A protein has these predicted regions:
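Conserved metal-binding segment of the jelly-roll/cupin
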Residues: 96, 126-128, 135-155, 165-166
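Conserved GNAT-family N-acetyltransferase fold
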Residues: 92, 115, 141
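Glycine-rich GHKL/ HATPase_c ATP-binding element in histidine kinases
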Residues: 159
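Conserved short histidine dyad/triad with adjacent acidic residue
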Residues: 73-78, 88-110, 132, 145-146, ...
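Non-cytosolic beta-sheet module surface loops
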Residues: 82, 105-107, 153
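A short, N-terminal "cap"/entry segment at the start of jelly-roll beta-barrel domains
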Residues: 2-90
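A short beta-strand-loop-beta hairpin characteristic of the jelly-roll/cupin
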Residues: 101-104, 108-137
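A generic fold-level signal
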Residues: 84-86, 109, 156
Length: 168
């Protein structure tokens, strides 16, 4: 593009200006089977009470996941499979670094969370505790509510973790 929008003009996961930018859910409904967008966080693939009332079981194919970017200084792809009052479940994909390791922007959640290392190893920095843990493929990690953390990729290729978070 000729002009790259600034952080203030961009909607992204936990973006500080998301509430001031237009909600695209209604605008995109006219597209029919529209792709999920950042505005769908907390409502994807549908409202939890709607799913419970219908007794619905909903499959989410790989191409239907809600893709959003976490962070602007150290961006990481987040692919949500579900995000509603049931909880939040998906994948975090952190690309390889450039001149050094790649770190995600720090994050913390209102509810408990867990990580499962699919492709690693993944280093989990607990910023406020000044501790680090290395997850090998198949390892899991519990994050109590309010724990500040970031993921670090020391590898030459992308790393991937599956996450479950009760409250973003």
């Amino acid at each position: 593009p000729k002009v790259i929008p600034s952080d203030e003009e961009t909607k992204f996961y936990k973006g500080p200006n998301n509430d001031r930018l237009p909600d695209m859910r209604d605008a995109m409904k006219a597209l029919g089977g529209r792709p999920a967008c950042t505005d769908d966080l907390g409502h994807f693939p549908a409202e939890g009470d709607e799913l419970r009332a219908a007794g619905a079981i909903v499959g989410v194919h790989n191409y239907e996941k809600l893709n959003t970017i976490h962070g602007t200084h150290h961006p990481m792809l987040m692919r949500f499979i579900t995000s509603n009052d049931f909880g939040n479940f998906g994948e975090m994909i952190l690309p390889a670094g450039g001149y050094g390791p790649r770190c995600s922007d720090p994050d913390k959640h209102g509810g408990d969370g867990c990580l499962y290392c699919v492709n690693g190893p993944i280093t989990v920095n607990l910023n406020e505790l000044e501790e680090s843990y290395v997850l090998q493929e198949g390892d899991s990690f519990f994050l109590p509510a309010g724990t500040s953390y970031q993921l670090v990729n020391f590898e030459a290729g992308p790393i991937k973790a599956v996450f479950g978070i009760t409250e973003l």
